[in-house]
UniProtKB/Swiss-Prot annotation:
Stretches assigned to the UmuC domain: 15-196
Family note: Belongs to the DNA polymerase type-Y family.
Enzyme's top EC category: transferase
Pfam family, one: IMS_HHH
PANTHER family: DNA POLYMERASE KAPPA (PTHR11076:SF33), DNA REPAIR POLYMERASE UMUC / TRANSFERASE FAMILY MEMBER (PTHR11076)
Site positions for Substrate discrimination: F24
GO MF: damaged DNA binding; DNA-directed DNA polymerase activity; magnesium ion binding
GO BP: any one term: SOS response
Annotated Basic and acidic residues bias: 235-246
Cofactors that this protein relies on: Mg(2+)
Protein name: DNA polymerase IV
Gene3D superfamilies per the UniProt record, alphabetical: 3.30.70.270, 3.40.1170.60, 5' to 3' exonuclease, C-terminal subdomain (1.10.150.20), DNA polymerase, Y-family, little finger domain (3.30.1490.100)
Keyword DNA-binding belongs to the record: yes
Length: 415
């Protein structure tokens, strides 16, 4: 054991990032082994040929098929493409089983999405070397769940995440700080985890195009352009990341959101606002189901030319109802939509906490209003859920129901 202990750093940490390969498609293959080796896509209604590719297998990617591609285009590239409708119940169960497997190796696990998570194995030397543990995890997921994954091994979260992206599928990559100048610095800033399109544009404006330039850039200029987040990114570009694996996030929620990618560009404001309301309702239901509230509402607008705008509104009081979420989202929409056609729309509730722990700053009138309407809203939701259609609606909702239902329009247009 003492020899194995020498395989671990004396002062630093050993972090694994486990990232499942083509997760939804892999779960479908595990559920139906006859799909093995076939070009497979998880997408919308294949009969209507109007669905969007959510994910696809590596066999499908060899034909040029990619995420968000319209299904008709994917079928044109690969006529023999096998299509499955998304089964999120199946995916959630597979995710649960995946984290159950990971928990056999260490209790220090932090999920970051349905199909990826970090493990701190610094104290796991009794199980073997870091590379041996990674191989055991990969093999366990593959043999027990028939789910492939890639794993990054590094001294911190950022480098572990970066390493797991380097070899797919079924890759295991070790990334040390001494590897950064050769393996990371030559890459463009757009390739760096944590840098989106807008941040990359801001960095480009101050003549930072590569990760090396970010690492060696003037801290004051970077802070002035991007703020504290820019300094955090610069530290990571140098290989420094002080974040720790947080096991308390097992079961916690950072955000609750929904988005819709359209099969064609949309520019009619009424239809886009209808979609925004639909997404707000979905977010509200998920918050209420988990007894959560939000102090910040965010919208994302992705235009036809791939420009992406993300804006948020900080709230004085916690909210969870559809009406309040839609009100905040629609205000953001009216302030930031430039009138151009839209390809994707999203609504996300952030700054989440348990409803029982939230402290709402109420005056007498708002307290009475909330106290009166909360039981009624619960009954309305229960009745509507029971019958599957909006039997009961508020007056404001009825004014928007003069045309056929949004669900019908959605299915006719996009599914």
């Amino acid at each position: 054991m003492s020899t194995m202990r020498e395989m671990y750093p004396k002062n630093g940490r050993v972090i694994l990032h486990v990232d499942m390969n083509c997760f939804f498609a892999s779960v479908e293959i595990a559920h139906d082994p006859s799909l093995q080796g076939k070009p497979l896509a998880v997408a919308g209604n294949e009969k209507e040929r109007k669905g969007i590719i959510i994910t696809c297998s590596y066999e499908a990617r060899e034909y040029g098929i990619r995420t968000t591609m319209p299904l008709w285009e994917a079928k044109r590239l690969c006529p023999q493409l096998v299509v499955r409708r998304p089964n999120f119940t199946l995916y959630r169960e597979a995710s649960f089983q995946m984290f159950q497997v990971l928990s056999r190796f260490t209790e220090k696990i932090q999920p970051v999405s349905i199909d990826e998570g970090y493990l701190d194995i610094t104290d796991c030397y009794a199980l073997g070397s870091p590379l041996e543990i990674a191989k055991m995890i990969q093999q366990a997921l593959l043999t027990e769940l028939q789910l492939p994954c890639s794993i990054g091994i590094a001294p911190n979260l950022f480098l572990a995440k970066t390493a797991s992206d380097m070899k797919k599928p079924l890759g295991i990559t070790v990334l040390r700080k001494r590897d950064i100048p050769e393996m990371i610095w030559p890459l463009s800033v757009e390739a760096m985890h944590g840098i989106g399109e807008k941040t990359a544009e801001k960095l480009n404006e101050i003549h930072i195009h590569t990760i090396e330039q970010l690492a060696k850039g003037d801290e004051h200029i970077i802070r002035a352009k991007i703020g504290k987040h820019g300094i955090d990114l610069q530290k990571r570009a140098k290989g420094t990341d002080d974040r720790e694996v947080d096991p308390s996030q097992m079961g916690q929620h950072k955000s609750v959101g929904n988005s819709m990618t359209f099969s064609k560009d949309m520019d009619e404001e009424k239809e886009l606002l209808d979609m925004l309301e639909r997404l707000s309702k979905s977010v509200s239901k998920r918050l209420q189901k988990r007894t959560l509230v939000s102090y910040n509402i965010q919208i994302m607008i992705k235009y036809h030319d791939r420009r992406t705008v993300t804006r948020s509104k900080q709230l004085k009081n916690a909210i969870w109802e559809e009406r309040d979420i839609f009100q905040a989202a629609s205000r953001l929409w009216k302030q930031h939509w430039d009138g151009d056609s839209v390809r994707l729309l999203g609504v996300t509730a952030t700054e989440i906490e348990w409803k029982t722990e939230s402290v709402k700053q109420l005056d007498l009138f708002s307290f009475e209003e909330d106290a009166k309407k909360e039981p009624l809203l619960a009954v309305i939701d229960q009745i509507n859920d029971k019958y599957g259609t909006p039997i009961l609606q508020r007056g404001s909702q009825l004014l928007r129901k003069q045309e056929k239902s949004f669900q019908q329009k959605l299915e006719n247009k996009f599914m």
